[in-house]
């Protein structure tokens, strides 16, 4: 799915899509999960907001370059989510939240110097996962 600049994809029920790209925004309703995954490499530069959850499944890389504000969880079950800032993963929880970011067979890729907030409560699922840091950058 490609979301055009100026458009908003309102996700009001749990949904699975093959791809996610574009400069438009995503609004996640409370408690729902948006799962995306395919073998391609996609970039979403719009803002993901709301109280829902994101799951990256399948192979390929999903680059989240917007200043995201969603408050739900992020699970990487396959492929890679690539970010250049902590807010690529949405709003930081007000206190440590176990499993706010779950690696379960996929990878988180950092592409710039930044600090991943400890309140995200990184968890490893049964399939484990990895955190990859681009050469010449620092993730703390």
Ranges and model annotations:
Residues 1-42, 49-63, 71-139:
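Beta-strand repeat architectures
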């Amino acid at each position: 799915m490609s979301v055009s600049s100026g458009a908003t994809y309102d996700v009001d029920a749990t949904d699975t899509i093959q791809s996610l790209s574009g400069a438009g925004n995503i609004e996640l309703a409370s408690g729902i999960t948006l799962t995306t995954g395919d073998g391609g490499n996609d970039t979403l530069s719009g803002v993901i907001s709301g109280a829902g959850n994101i799951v990256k499944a399948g192979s390929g890389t999903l680059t989240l370059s917007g200043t995201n504000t969603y408050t739900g969880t992020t699970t990487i079950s396959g492929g890679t989510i690539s970010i250049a800032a902590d807010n690529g993963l949405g709003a930081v929880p007000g206190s440590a939240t176990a499993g706010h970011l779950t690696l379960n067979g996929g990878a988180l890729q950092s592409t710039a110097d930044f600090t991943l907030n400890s309140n995200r409560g990184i968890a490893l699922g049964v399939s484990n996962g990895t955190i990859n840091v681009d050469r010449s950058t620092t993730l703390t």
